[in-house]
Amino acid sequence: MAVPKRKTTPSKRGMRRSADALKQPAYVENPDSGELHRPHHVDLKSGMYRGKQILKPKGE
């Protein structure tokens, strides 16, 4: 069975756990409608992605 050779310092333990924290999701503003949406995702209200119509808007 594998056993650690040295004790893990609090600094190293904290550096390892730093990736476990919850991060606030990023949002970008749609230049056409001004609505917020996730980057690299389709804007669900307008159905646009990178200037192209991908989905039909919900209002139609």
Swiss-Prot record:
One MF term in GO for this entry? structural constituent of ribosome
Annotated Basic residues bias? 1-16
Gene Ontology cellular component? large ribosomal subunit
User: Where is composition skewed (Basic and acidic residues) in this entry?
Assistant: 34-44
Q: InterPro entries from the xrefs?
A: Ribosomal_bL32, Ribosomal_bL32_bact, Ribosomal_zn-bd
Q: Which GO terms describe its biological process?
A: translation
What are the entry keywords? Ribonucleoprotein, Ribosomal protein
Q: Name one Pfam family in it.
A: Ribosomal_L32p
Report residue spans for region: Disordered: 1-60
Asked if the record carries the keyword Kinase, the reply is no
Instruction: Give the family this protein belongs to, as stated in its UniProt record.
Output: Belongs to the bacterial ribosomal protein bL32 family.
Name of the protein in its database record: Large ribosomal subunit protein bL32
